[in-house]
């Protein structure tokens, strides 16, 4: 027992000693474009913390007017204040957006459209992960409702503003977890069977399929769209899982920081020449492969139609 404990102690001591080298290896790609954004308007959901906050910070540093769209306005204002000071850009604004409530989504969109005549970048970044079973205000399973349907509706409501501002981009933050996901059309609300882990994976697959179908429907409009995997990042998303919280504490020296996790979102929002890759999936600032389910055009179209039906909208 003592020998085993000693070996484990030595192993973890060694890991932490070489952590800087390991982290450098796993830090991933870097957005290298120097594009500046004066006069450009950006909306980022969930930008009060984590990857979204770092994405907002970078875009604000390039001169964009950035809207932090989040549920907790107080946390949003705290993040915005910090970003304004860091970037010397006063045009960092906070607006309430609760993706678990379609009334809130519609109210946000109505307010934004009244304020702004243009929208150049929409980053659908917010999300939930491994929540206990619950439903949104509209009766959707929470992962499906927040991670997919909420952003689906938001994009629909803001799309005409994106079109008149073209060239414009929509970035959907997905995850490598989509490889495990499937779309359970027979039980979309997980009422028959629920696994918090699989529910998250299913919603991330929905993000990739939405991106694929959206790109097809946006051809010729000047609006392009991309799905991204940010990497394994220190994040508040794991707060609903005590096991993941423990693992995060143990392995935090080896995972990406929020700033590193933001790089692929920034790349897809800013990099020149990505238009031919609209609808594709990116990781570490380069296109990468998706699961066979994520390449299924029939599933993508069916999900689109079912999403419209659930939300009560017509989106041809």
Curated annotation (Swiss-Prot):
Signal peptide bounds: none
Broad class of enzyme this protein falls into: oxidoreductase
UniProt record, GO biological process: cellular detoxification of aldehyde; photoreceptor cell maintenance; retinoid metabolic process; retinol metabolic process; visual perception
UniProt-reported outcome of changing residue 145 to E: In retinal dystrophy; exhibits a profound loss of catalytic activity
Binding locations of substrate: 175
Record EC number: 1.1.1.300
UniProt entry keywords in alphabetical sequence: Disease variant, Endoplasmic reticulum, Leber congenital amaurosis, Lipid metabolism, Membrane, NADP, Oxidoreductase, Retinitis pigmentosa, Sensory transduction, Vision
Keyword rRNA-binding found: no
Residue stretches in coiled coil: none
Catalysed reaction equations from the record: all-trans-retinol + NADP(+) = all-trans-retinal + NADPH + H(+); 11-cis-retinol + NADP(+) = 11-cis-retinal + NADPH + H(+); 9-cis-retinol + NADP(+) = 9-cis-retinal + NADPH + H(+); a 4-hydroxynonen-1-ol + NADP(+) = a 4-hydroxynonenal + NADPH + H(+)
Annotated active site: 200 (proton acceptor)
Effect caused by changing residue 285 to Y: In retinal dystrophy; exhibits a profound loss of catalytic activity
Effect recorded for residue 151 to D: In LCA13; exhibits a profound loss of catalytic activity
Effect of residue 146 to D: In RP53; uncertain significance
Single GO term (MF): 11-cis-retinol dehydrogenase activity
Record's function text: Retinoids dehydrogenase/reductase with a clear preference for NADP. Displays high activity towards 9-cis, 11-cis and all-trans-retinal. Shows very weak activity towards 13-cis-retinol. Also exhibits activity, albeit with lower affinity than for retinaldehydes, towards lipid peroxidation products (C9 aldehydes) such as 4-hydroxynonenal and trans-2-nonenal. May play an important function in photoreceptor cells to detoxify 4-hydroxynonenal and potentially other toxic aldehyde products resulting from lipid peroxidation. Has no dehydrogenase activity towards steroids.
Name of the protein: Retinol dehydrogenase 12
């Amino acid at each position: 027992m003592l020998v085993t404990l000693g070996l484990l102690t030595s192993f973890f001591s060694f890991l932490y000693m070489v952590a800087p080298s390991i982290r450098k290896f796993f830090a991933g790609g870097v957005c290298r474009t120097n594009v500046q954004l004066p006069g450009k308007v950006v909306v980022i959901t969930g930008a009060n913390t984590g990857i979204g906050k770092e994405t907002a910070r970078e875009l604000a540093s390039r001169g964009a007017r950035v809207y932090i769209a989040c549920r907790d306005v107080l946390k949003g204002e705290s993040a915005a204040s910090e970003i304004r000071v860091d970037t010397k850009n006063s045009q960092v604004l906070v607006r309430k957006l609760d993706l678990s409530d379609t009334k809130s989504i519609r109210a946000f969109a109505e307010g934004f459209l009244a304020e702004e005549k243009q929208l150049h970048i929409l980053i659908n970044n917010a999300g939930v992960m491994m929540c206990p079973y619950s439903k949104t205000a509209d009766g959707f399973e929470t992962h499906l409702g927040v991670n997919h349907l909420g952003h689906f509706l938001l994009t629909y409501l803001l799309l005409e503003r994106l079109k008149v501002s073209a060239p414009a981009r929509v970035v959907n933050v997905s995850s490598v977890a989509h490889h495990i996901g499937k779309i359970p059309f027979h039980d979309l609300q997980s009422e028959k069977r629920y696994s918090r882990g699989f529910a998250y994976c299913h919603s991330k697959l929905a993000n990739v399929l939405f991106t694929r179908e959206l790109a097809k429907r946006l051809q010729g409009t000047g609006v392009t769209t991309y799905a991204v995997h940010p990497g394994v990042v220190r994040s508040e998303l794991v707060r609903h899982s005590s096991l993941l919280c423990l693992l995060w504490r143990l392995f935090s020296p080896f995972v990406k920081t929020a700033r590193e996790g933001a790089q692929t979102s920034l790349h897809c929002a800013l990099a020149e020449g990505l238009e031919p890759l609209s609808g594709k999936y990116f990781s570490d600032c380069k296109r990468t492969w998706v699961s066979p389910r994520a390449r299924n055009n029939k599933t993508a179209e069916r999900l689109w139609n079912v999403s419209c039906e659930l939300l009560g909208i017509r989106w041809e």
